[in-house]
Amino acid sequence: GWASKIGQTLGKMAKVGLQELIQPK
């Protein structure tokens, strides 16, 4: 459903954001 889709999107964004914080380019 739409809820799980939003959850996956937020999870991806959080993951990418965390990687950027750990290893800034």
Curated annotation (Swiss-Prot):
Coiled coil: none
Membrane-spanning segments: none
Main location per the UniProt record: secreted
GO CC annotations, alphabetized: extracellular region
GO BP annotations listed: defense response
Family of this protein: Belongs to the gastrin/cholecystokinin family. Magainin subfamily.
Subcellular location: Secreted
Protein role: Antimicrobial peptide.
Descriptive protein name: Xenoposin precursor fragment R2
Superkingdom of this protein's organism: Eukaryota
Keywords, alphabetical: Amphibian defense peptide, Antimicrobial, Secreted
Tissue: Expressed by the skin glands.
